[in-house]
């Protein structure tokens, strides 16, 4: 027995022993993830039994490198992958396909090295029968990391059951410009909230088995003009204050992978930035996993290097360990021959890959048990719908029109109107597989489910981006004969409307043209926009419905912070739901009915107009205010805002100390304690948030920064004391020498909920 075959040895030692046995070609093969897994097979039916046939391209790739490092997207299903329930992998066939692929690799690998599988999981597994969650932006609105952790624990069990080694999860992007099409993949505009959610998602997923590849590093949410993959024109301090905290949190939580971002920062692509991929995440943050490329990103370095071989060498030297769909990493042998990279540098990356394979037990247990179902029942695993419930945000509730109690609605006629009222894919978000209709609940479905004693009437009213006179007239007639109106508006990241795609899967703007029904993917990867208003057709519909004199509740389902100024002027009640997932319609109906107490808080600020962007709350505290001569100051709705149905009485708030030195702060922290009482007749949530403002410092500070929060449930009439803790980091800054320090001085402390200040105090940090 050779050392690498000895399971009693440490994974790192086995990896080193195996590396010594490998040829250069075999090493290069371990760093490649060139294949699109969904294209390596064809599904066939032989004698009534489903099976797959592996492609010649796959066979040649395995032969070329005597093995395979990582295979992307074997289970991926969506219009870009061209896989659905007829052509893709589902049920037992998924596990059989995994075993067939793994068996072929092992049998054609000279050293018997198994392949690792990576799979998209931005909000649940992008696979047939994948357990789907609301998008990250809604998860951020829950202000409930424990719920996010629980949801990803369920998702992780499914991925583990399917043999997925790497869950590719969006969590590092901080949303600074809502024009960006991938806004939905961000948790927040705030680094602290984003970091807490990233930490929870990593822990939840990895508790169930798969390793997390956290993406994207870094500053992809800061693209110029909100354009995808465009330059982030910021400096090191902005990177450290805003964009690094989620990565640091994910790494601290145990993430084994980091995916580099497409964009460049100050003229250097992230995939060619050794300071980012080595100095920051490895030396400063202590990361010891693999750095993965984003799709075709290494080849895109050709625009800078002019030579694909040089691009591969540059990415490797900069810290990328594993490629994705690129040609450049397949040419690393040539790079060695040309003296562009040393074999020792390749060895370092290969060691990381092999160590993970040993840690995951793939050498001893390379195959899956083929029995058992992969489908996860949403009713028995309610974490997805619970996320949706907690993440819906009430923006307006004129005269307490909400909730519309079920007994109050009994026998009433309820009109459910709008282009997003009964379109399942429009509430799911991007990176979504085909979904079995029985697994989804639209708003129309949800209203029928909850308001069983009411007469539910549906009318579409218009298309997403196109007016239709007949649909509009039908909707107005329906509303005239109804008692209350639920008008469901918004956008769509659905890839199921005839869009075409780039080589990396991003939707192409030129070809994603609206069909005769005006269906258009207006959000998601590649769908950046210059106007954040709802389309004219939808605003006209809302106005026409309100002119009937009926009470109108607007529900907006979308993937980015929109300008909802007109919507809030017209409607009596407004509910915002960032793509709430497959059971989102149920959650919305439950909130409307009062079965669920709304508790979502905005994880982003909503602008009054597109020209007001950027409108994030934590801007720099310079002597000039962030105002315009032709627009009201401040956002339409600020970060942290969200209404509920209950009333709460806040009592005395106090600090554990009003003055201490850095050593004492580091040892004991600062505790903010307050009492609160639910004075309403039903239970409900509060979401207390602590903001800190540095009054005087050596660098320009922000007007305020979120440093702590907690989601707290109070039964009717219940009173309790809540305590929130601030550590030393809450008072630290990056000084002029770019050192992370706590400077002595005065800090303002603010306690708020739903953007309402409850208490303000001061704390002094001494030398």
Residue spans for each PLM region:
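Glycoside hydrolase catalytic-domain context in secreted enzymes
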Residues: 1-735, 741-757, 762, 766-767
